[in-house]
Amino acid sequence: MAREFSLEKTRNIGIMAHIDAGKTTTTERILFYTGRVHKIGEVHEGAATMDWMEQEQERGITITSAATTAQWKGHRINIIDTPGHVDFTVEVERSLRVLDGAITVLDAQSGVEPQTETVWRQATTYGVPRIVFVNKMDKIGADFLYSVKTLHDRLQANAHPVQLPIGAEDQFSGIIDLVEMCAYHYHDELGKNIERIDIPEEYRDMAEEYHNKLIEAVAELDEELMMKYLEGEEITTEELKAAIRKATISVEFFPVFCGSAFKNKGVQLLLDGVVDYLPSPVDIPAIRGVVPDTEEEVTREASDDAPFAALAFKIMTDPYVGKLTFIRVYSGTLDSGSYVMNTTKGKRERIGRLLQMHANHRQEISKVYAGDIAAAVGLKDTTTGDTLCDEKHPVILESMQFPEPVISVAIEPKSKADQDKMSQALQKLQEEDPTFRAHTDPETGQTIISGMGELHLDIIVDRMRREFKVEANVGAPQVAYRETFRKSAQVEGKFIRQSGGRGQYGHVWIEFSPNERGKGFEFENAIVGGVVPKEYVPAVQAGLEEAMQNGVLAGYPVVDIKAKLFDGSYHDVDSSEMAFKIAASLALKNAATKCDPVLLEPIMKVEVVIPEEYLGDIMGDITSRRGRIEGMEARGNAQVVRAMVPMAEMFGYATSLRSNTQGRGTFSMVFDHYEEVPKNIADEIIKKNKGE
């Protein structure tokens, strides 16, 4: 199967936006105009082609990024749909990692919204060129120039219109092209009947003004164009297009388009913009990687002749073909049925079948080429972020960085039959989503699931019910407390049972003392003259370690203490390992009264990124959660607050931050260290655990 589209005519793009800006509808229209969908699916009716999971159709939000391929004017456009909800930012990060360019969709009434800020920041991190589509021009309150202003004010983006709308709200009837200096008039509802016309008289001055502003903005980034402009020479449409393309690809300039995807206006011109201004795989720097073992840095050029290298960016479980691994091919070619090396895991994998995905149906292909996005069937060990490559030319492409989960809840199956199904479901869901974790708590035996937010875990539990038919109860979030000693003391532990027949005799003196935080348990044998025989010393240590697991205050494990066995006695006949084990555990119990035990709690290192105007509220909120502010800094137009906050106070924080900042704040947290719980709070926890 020969290559259908050259690399220069391939575009890998994502569509990113705030929730409800009309991203899915825009994607739908692109698929409709590129001839991939025969009937347009409306999100309002829950039938969009890209939203293929049941829950997405119900909630009307896009959760997983489906990858679709479409064709426009001799170009192949691969589209990755990305979610717009805060809890799903990992999906967005994943998609951005494998894209060459993106369309940012704005709502013409709101302009740049909170989640737009977040995805824009992520796209800037990955250096993704963007064009902007101001959507919903037909909506009441639509204001194109206000939306462009929010790009400058909220994102400091060098964004300039390449189009102007003719009319707005229900009067929106056409678009002015500021590059070619002509206009397009729409005659029908489906937007298929477009007429190219001269710019209407009443818009001519405005068009002229914005045409000149566009040339000035682009000329600032292009010396040749600047010279021509200053000397008053005519700048041709081709020269202007080439200069916009160059500035867009170098992420110094963002062209702004307008339209209404719902009313089918402006989508074809947006597609022209994708072809004209967004990069092909050849236009972006070659991907970097390292050779396993030697750590030597290498690059992989976007070329079919280079050795094969690809990145797995998404795992999905498909009801018909099983596990699908979505891959972005950076270099070389790959045949179905061949073997590849997963260098991240160090395992060889066989590619069973290769599928090119259209949002709701799939087409089997025999080969993929550099620059392609496809789904592979049959990979067993590959997870998100892994590199697949030619066995003879191993490379590890830089992998994706995923944030640690920030919220945990206990989950238990409703019936015995659900137990096995639940562990299978959790394993599959973890493979698909690197920010979701599941583990069994050895102390309580409960299964604990952790994720990026409350909505994230809701959807996981929901998917377990729908896709894996597992019914489960979800508990309240839990904190892993610990206990330790503050004072040193010498304590006796005596276990003697002698009432006829074989007795039990174990007797120890142990000196307990606090150890440095994080150092764990240290045991020392200081017996002189065999008062406790050597063979019983390991039993003393084991007895202490077992007893420490159950705590002395509230049933939490004891950590960071030293124990020195310095005296004791034994009986020739009645002493045994068991007796000394019990004696040691009694010594630990007795230490509770003498060593001043305290509760420890996990302290999280929290970083909150918020617009300046919310700074006071957020700092007040952190302090009310027993947090200590460690520092602040400005990052662009946002403020970053760093603080240490007890884990117990962080429950519900994602939701509270979202409402305190209208969704414009984001936060991340990682475990830092354990610290003493204040006495009044510790007393409550101890009371609760003793069931008082």
Curated annotation (Swiss-Prot):
Residues 8-282 form the tr-type G domain. Pfam families: EFG_C (PF00679), EFG_III (PF14492), EFG_IV (PF03764), GTP_EFTU (PF00009), GTP_EFTU_D2 (PF03144). The keyword Nucleotide-binding applies. Belongs to the TRAFAC class translation factor GTPase superfamily. Classic translation factor GTPase family. EF-G/EF-2 subfamily. The lineage of its organism: Bacteria, Bacillati, Bacillota, Bacilli, Bacillales. The gene is fusA. It is found in: Cytoplasm. PANTHER family: RIBOSOME-RELEASING FACTOR 2, MITOCHONDRIAL, TRANSLATION ELONGATION FACTOR G-RELATED. GO terms for biological process: ribosome disassembly. GTP binds at residues 17-24, 81-85, 135-138. It comes from the Bacteria. GO terms for molecular function: GTP binding; GTPase activity; translation elongation factor activity. SMART domains: EFG_C (SM00838), EFG_IV (SM00889). This is Elongation factor G. Keywords: Cytoplasm, Elongation factor, GTP-binding, Nucleotide-binding, Protein biosynthesis.
